[in-house]
Amino acid sequence: MRVLFVASEAHPFIKSGGLGDVAGALPKELARKGVDVRVVIPKYREINNELKNKLRFNKWFNVDVGWRNQYCGILEYEYDGVIYYFVDNEYYFSRGGMYGHYDDAERFAFFDRAVLDMIKQLDWKPNIIHCNDWQTGMIPVLLKLEYMRKDMFYWDIKSVFSIHNIAFQGVFDPVILPELFGYDYEQYTNTNLKFDDGVGFMKGAINYSDMITTVSYSYAEEIKTPEFGERLDWLLREKSYMLRGILNGIDYDEFNPKNDNLINKNYDVNNINDKYENKRNLQSELGLNVNENIPIIAMVTRLTSQKGLDLLVNISERLLQNDIQLVIVGTGDKHYEDHFKWLDYKYGNKVSANIRFDNNLAHKVYAASDMFLMPSLFEPCGLGQLIALRYGSIPIVRETGGLKDTIRAYNEYTGEGNGFSFYNYNADELLHIIEYALKIYYDKNKWSNLVKNAMNSNNSWSKSADEYLNMYKELSYR
């Protein structure tokens, strides 16, 4: 089984969010299961310098982008048993930032065609091309409309498209069809690519892929509804026979408190008390009162409305009347950043607002915190709650998407469950469930058992990789 995993980012080379984690961890797990899996991403300027210097040039060729004929270099590097390819073009990818440029349509039109040209240039034919999010959305379109019709090399390659966040669809002016792809407007007028008055990369992928996946069971159901479907819900209902939800996992090699070299004191489920040394160290480092008995409630997140920040802003002053400490790590919308900076200023030794993304600090926060907040408005899967479980920080989540699938509400009478949850997007419900969690926290026997439940939760990639592998096999036999 040969699989080409195509993404716009991949850890440890470069990442901006959960997609990068998936593209770094899932292929590694598939390789362990005997799959010949290779990953391809753009060669951005910001790729980790230490790794960038190890990339080996393979070959170059030209790629047609409408009337343009652009240079494409292919570099490669083997990491953790997986071959990574890097598509090189200085004009498109040697810039500040991966996304948000005026010509993103052209940049990823080039990338998508370069990927299809690359596999023939390298004479490596995958059974499956697994595409991820809108940046790779035109690959299934190009494959079906052009490459399979013109060249027998491509005729039996199947495509999978994974939706990591349906809110980002890649919609551009219809002029890109002739300008970037050399197509007429038929695909626009027949609505296969038409989204409002534009061309949608994601819509094209949904229409032309052989299978569609998303990152949790609940999110697969949610995006078929008007509330969550971002106006593609009707199409996903139509395609529901080929839509599957497969839960993300986390990389147990990277996120393991037993041997994590970014935290102060290693620990596991058999010596949970060592977690308190991490807590005291973090309190000291962040200027909080050093007291292991005060619960630390943490968020490591993008500071956006999707993450439920409106709810936390609403209750923050009431919440801080409790004997707690609040730690925030992340960047995002300025009004949220300013609010948490103000709380930090006002409450000093009770609040630490770290308005930056700092991976080292994030690991320390997971290891030191007692509770981890994710009151998201919507959450396709969520990785934060999975990492928190691994480190024995108890998730407090809203029941949506992957949060609903991975967090089982604690039952104080049976001792079952691995976190706390609430249903309605309501600030008072959030405050109520946090205060309930605080009540359980002060019952040390119950809390200790809850932490063990959390740390014993299995959220590795192994089970999910089996589901992907079964899907690949099913597709390749069609």
Swiss-Prot record:
Single biological process term from Gene Ontology: glycogen biosynthetic process
Entry keyword annotation includes Magnesium: no
SUPFAM superfamilies the UniProt entry points to: UDP-Glycosyltransferase/glycogen phosphorylase (SSF53756)
Positions contributing to ADP-alpha-D-glucose binding: K15
EC number(s) from the headed UniProt entry: 2.4.1.21
Protein's pathway: Glycan biosynthesis; glycogen biosynthesis
Annotated Gene3D superfamilies: Glycogen Phosphorylase B
CDD domains assigned to the protein according to its UniProt record, in alphabetical order: GT5_Glycogen_synthase_DULL1-like
Pfam families: Glyco_transf_5, Glycos_transf_1
Keywords: Glycogen biosynthesis, Glycosyltransferase, Transferase
Catalysed reactions, as listed in the record: [(1->4)-alpha-D-glucosyl](n) + ADP-alpha-D-glucose = [(1->4)-alpha-D-glucosyl](n+1) + ADP + H(+)
Protein family: Belongs to the glycosyltransferase 1 family. Bacterial/plant glycogen synthase subfamily.
Function, as annotated: Synthesizes alpha-1,4-glucan chains using ADP-glucose.
Protein name: Glycogen synthase
Species of provenance: Clostridium botulinum (strain Alaska E43 / Type E3)
Source species taxonomy: Bacteria, Bacillati, Bacillota, Clostridia, Eubacteriales
